[in-house]
Amino acid sequence: MKRIAFVFSTVPHGTAAGREGLDALLATSALTDELAVFFIADGVFQLLPGQKPDAVLARDYIATFKLLGLYDIEQCWVCAASLRERGLDPQTPFVVEATPLEADALRRELANYDVILRF
C-alpha cells in the first residue's frame, strides 16, 4: 500500500481547502493506515482551538481534527519555522498533538511518502 501524506498549508476559513482536506483524510484512513498529516505555512492555523468561523459565516470543522486519534492517525507534524513566523509557540495547546519539526527535517519526513495531497 502506498504511503500518503496530507499537507495543510492554507488558513482554515475563507476557503474550503482545509475542510475538504480533513474530509479526504478521514475517508482515506478507512483504506490505509500509512498516513501522515503535515501542517505548514498558514496551515498551522488549522491547529488552533477557539476559532470563531461563524463570524465569517463558515462551518466550524476545526474540532473534527480531534477525531484523528480515533481514526488511528497518529503521525502529525507541524513546521516549527512556520509557527515562529506566525508568532505561535510550539507549546501552544493545539487541537491535535503535532510534533514540531524544523523545515529540513520536515522535508526529509515528507520524502518518505509516495503520495502527497496538499490542501
UniProtKB/Swiss-Prot annotation:
Domain of life: Bacteria
InterPro entries to which the protein is assigned, alphabetical: DsrEFH-like, Sulphur_relay_DsrE/F-like, Sulphur_relay_TusC, Sulphur_relay_TusC/DsrF
Location of the protein in the cell: Cytoplasm
Signal peptide coordinates: none
Reported function: Part of a sulfur-relay system required for 2-thiolation of 5-methylaminomethyl-2-thiouridine (mnm(5)s(2)U) at tRNA wobble positions.
Species this chain originates from: Shigella dysenteriae serotype 1 (strain Sd197)
Keyword Iron-sulfur carried by entry: no
Keywords assigned by UniProt, alphabetized: Cytoplasm, tRNA processing
UniProt cross-references to PANTHER family, sorted A to Z: PROTEIN TUSC
Self-association and partners: Heterohexamer, formed by a dimer of trimers. The hexameric TusBCD complex contains 2 copies each of TusB, TusC and TusD. The TusBCD complex interacts with TusE.
UniProt cross-references to NCBIfam families, sorted A to Z: PRK00211.1, sulf_tusC_dsrF
A Gene Ontology biological process term: tRNA processing
Family: Belongs to the DsrF/TusC family.
Cellular component aspect of the GO annotation: cytoplasm
Gene that encodes the chain: tusC
Annotated protein name in UniProt: Protein TusC
